[in-house]
UniProtKB/Swiss-Prot annotation:
NCBIfam families reported for this sequence: DNA_bind_WhiA
GO BP annotations listed: cell division; regulation of sporulation
Keywords for the protein's UniProt record, in alphabetical order: Cell cycle, Cell division, DNA-binding
InterPro entries: Homing_endonucl, Sporu_reg_WhiA_N_dom, Sporulation_regulator_WhiA, Sporulation_regulator_WhiA_C, WhiA_LAGLIDADG_dom
Function field: Involved in cell division and chromosome segregation.
PANTHER family per UniProt: CELL DIVISION PROTEIN WHIA-RELATED
MF-aspect GO terms: DNA binding
UniProt organism field: Corynebacterium diphtheriae (strain ATCC 700971 / NCTC 13129 / Biotype gravis)
Similarity annotation: Belongs to the WhiA family.
Presence of the UniProt keyword Ion transport in the record: no
Gene responsible for this protein: whiA
Name this polypeptide is given: Probable cell division protein WhiA
Length: 328
């Protein structure tokens, strides 16, 4: 488990909710994303396997406090196929009562495959709790980078879609993704990752994430301009800044008339002013070639310049001034 992931989990286990619904939502999510429910000889057993001992202790404590059901903690040491120890919360008595109380079976006894309906249609705090539980169970947060982001490994497609729905209720865009046979939910946008960390209750980690992200985004420009002998880099930086300024002007001119696919390319150019076209393509979701990015930006500027001409107002080139490019 990476340092940031561990930091998030250490912070989340200290989050306490006064709402019983939210506590149950978090527990249901943990069972769904880290648990297995098995029946043998007519007896149901739940095992929740976690990578953090403190999380396992929290889960056992919540089960006891919410439902007066005892849970046993079992530590699994490192193995040849697994270097890190695992911690299992085992419920052998009243397991059926537990899964019914958290909503993982319907009143008629049918198993719920994704998340319980009361979470999907519940309050914002329920959605936050579901994400908190999912991250404690199977979440990872990587350092800001080209493929950075927050992800949760999911037991099935239905669970991933349910988590995507919870993110949508929080105003965030998450995407289901299948990698090497494992279903995942991924959030790549840096601002969205920060917002979700705050929503879950990891406010300190959110500050660390934002600082790391800001340093990383500032570094490419500093690296490029440090070598003033490299005229190509300077020309590229000037062109990127000029294009970003023109795109901003274009978006103002076009207003709501901007097609979505052109708006996406324009927003990337504005948000990452010093990035190369190739870097913008990698930041797009889904990713694009640099030629595709360039083509969309070119069409956006052409549309805006044509509309400006029709309206009798200055076109996008008016914002490209010597003052704008003085630092390059």
């Amino acid at each position: 488990m990476g340092a940031l992931s561990a930091q998030v989990k250490d912070e989340l286990i200290k989050v306490s909710s006064t709402k019983q619904r939210s506590r149950i939502a978090e527990l249901a999510s943990i069972i769904r994303f880290a648990g297995s429910i098995d029946s043998a000889l007519g007896k149901t057993v739940i095992e929740i396997e976690l990578d953090n001992e403190a999380v396992a202790i929290r889960v056992a404590k919540e089960i006891e406090e919410l439902f007066a059901i005892s849970a046993k903690l079992v530590d699994l040491g490192p193995m040849a196929t697994r270097r890190t120890p695992r911690h299992v919360v085992r419920i052998a008595e009243d397991a059926e009562t537990l899964i019914r109380r958290v909503g993982l079976v319907t009143r008629s006894g049918h198993a719920v495959v994704g998340l319980p309906p009361q979470i999907i249609s519940g309050s914002i705090s329920d959605a936050e709790a579901a994400w908190r539980g999912a991250f404690l169970a199977a979440g990872q947060l990587s350092d800001p980078g080209r493929t950075s982001g927050l992800e949760v490994a999911c037991p099935c497609l239905e669970a991933s879609l349910a988590l995507v729905g919870c993110a949508r209720r929080l105003g965030l865009s998450a995407k289901p993704k299948e990698t090497r046979g494992v279903e995942k939910v991924v959030i790549r946008d840096g601002e969205a990752v920060g917002a979700l960390l705050s929503r879950m209750g990891a406010h300190k980690t959110r500050l660390v994430w934002d600082q790391k992200r800001a340093r990383r985004e500032a570094r490419p420009l500093g690296n490029r301009l440090a070598n003033f002998d490299d005229a190509n880099l300077r020309r590229s930086a000037r062109a990127a800044v000029a294009a970003a300024a023109r795109v901003e002007r274009a978006m103002t001119i076009l207003g709501d008339d901007v097609p979505d696919h052109l708006a996406q390319a324009g927003q990337l150019r504005v948000q990452h002013r010093q990035a190369s076209l190739e870097e913008l393509g990698r930041l797009a979701d889904p990713q694009m070639t640099k030629d595709a990015v360039a083509g969309r930006i070119r069409r956006l500027l052409h549309m805006a310049d044509k509309k400006a001409s029709d309206m009798g107002i200055p076109d996008t080139s008016v914002v490209v001034t010597e003052e704008l490019l003085d630092d390059f």
